């Protein structure tokens, strides 16, 4: 394994350095080839490194930042006033080549905007998308995007997400001819928003894509598709709902029947069943797949949940390591170029044509 360097926005997220710095030390313990640049307030970071040994400290560097982008800041305003912030400094380290990837639990909109501004999208990609690989009940994986980078998506963006998701499934997850579906409120062709229906019409015409139609949210964990595409609003709500249900289920496994008097053999049986079921469903624990990759950029950026705990943030760091090792941006760009040698131009949907015509008619004099 070759050495690699990551930039961490340790000030981002709900808990800031109290979670991100211990997670950084945990990541260093599990990867001897990793170097971390901790971007943030040195006065807040330094005390949390008191337990770090000499070897860990040799692979750590504090990069001072003057401010933090608030989680509730409007993205446009946050970007305008971002100079000197921990998030921007971390991204600039990637842009300058001092780090190979960035990890942040900060404001999603600001991270999306700054990453697009500083690292630039892959040629032909309109907007990057947040993507993650979720486990499903068949013990396989499903690539899901967008998870919140773009609240409103037109049909062209959805088609681009589908192509990028399929490439990721092939090049990184190792799937052959991955099935691609659009998340919708029903499987019938006339169901859903016009953007979804128009995207479906275009996806059917792409011979390089194994498009299988619509999928409903209750089938997310069934393994019926390899790539699931949706707008960022729907994807974010769907993901967090799923995570909440899984956390509740795992919590019930641990606490069911507590406080009730039972015979010793029933208690032993209950504990055995709880441990067995917990192991069986542990792969669904949201902490184990924290970290969404901002797909479509020329550099690697990982967005962690804002509410991530130490374990979850360390998983996001590992996601960044894998993104660098697997050369995700480079492989996505190369695959798109091979699929579309004349340029990544997609057929226009009816709504996109109408929208362009209306903007031309209603333009400024």
Curated annotation (Swiss-Prot):
This is Phosphate acyltransferase. It is an enzyme of class 2 (transferase). NCBIfam families: plsX (TIGR00182). It comes from Klebsiella pneumoniae (strain 342). Pathway: Lipid metabolism; phospholipid metabolism. GO terms for biological process: fatty acid biosynthetic process; phospholipid biosynthetic process. Catalyzes the reversible formation of acyl-phosphate (acyl-PO(4)) from acyl-[acyl-carrier-protein] (acyl-ACP). This enzyme utilizes acyl-ACP as fatty acyl donor, but not acyl-CoA. Belongs to the PlsX family.
């Amino acid at each position: 394994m070759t050495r690699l360097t990551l930039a961490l926005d340790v000030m981002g997220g709900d808990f800031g350095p109290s979670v991100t710095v211990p997670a950084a030390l945990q990541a260093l313990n599990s990867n001897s080839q990793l170097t971390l640049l901790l971007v943030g307030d040195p006065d807040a970071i330094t005390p949390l490194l008191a337990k770090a040994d000499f070897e860990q400290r040799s692979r750590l560097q504090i990069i001072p930042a003057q401010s933090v982008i608030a989680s509730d800041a409007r993205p446009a305003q946050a970007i305008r006033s971002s100079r000197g912030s921990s998030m921007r400094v971390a991204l600039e380290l990637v842009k300058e080549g001092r780090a190979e990837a960035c990890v942040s639990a900060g404001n999603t909109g600001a991270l999306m905007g700054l990453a697009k501004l500083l690292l630039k999208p892959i040629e032909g990609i309109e907007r990057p998308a947040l993507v993650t690989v979720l486990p499903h009940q068949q013990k396989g994986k499903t690539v899901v995007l967008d998870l919140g980078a773009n609240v409103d998506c037109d049909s062209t963006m959805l088609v681009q997400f589908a192509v990028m998701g399929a490439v990721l499934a092939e090049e990184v997850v190792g799937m052959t001819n991955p099935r691609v579906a659009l998340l919708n409120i029903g499987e019938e062709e006339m169901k859903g928003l016009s953007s979804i229906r128009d995207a479906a019409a275009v996806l059917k015409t792409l011979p390089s894509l194994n498009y299988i139609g619509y999928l409903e949210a209750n089938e997310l964990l069934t393994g019926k598709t390899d790539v699931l595409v949706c707008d960022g609003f729907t994807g974010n709500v769907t993901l967090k709902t799923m995570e909440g249900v899984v956390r509740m289920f795992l919590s019930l496994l641990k606490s069911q029947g507590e406080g009730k008097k039972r015979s010793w053999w029933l208690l032993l049986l209950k504990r055995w069943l709880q441990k067995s079921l917990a192991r069986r469903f542990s792969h669904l624990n949201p902490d184990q797949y924290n970290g969404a990759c901002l797909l479509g950029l020329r550099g690697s950026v990982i967005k962690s949940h804002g509410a991530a705990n130490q374990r979850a943030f360390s998983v996001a760091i590992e996601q960044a390591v894998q993104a660098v090792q697997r050369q995700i941006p480079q492989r996505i760009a190369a695959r798109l170029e091979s699929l579309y040698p004349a340029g990544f131009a997609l057929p226009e949907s009816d709504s996109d044509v109408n929208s362009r015509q209306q903007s031309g008619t209603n333009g400024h004099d």
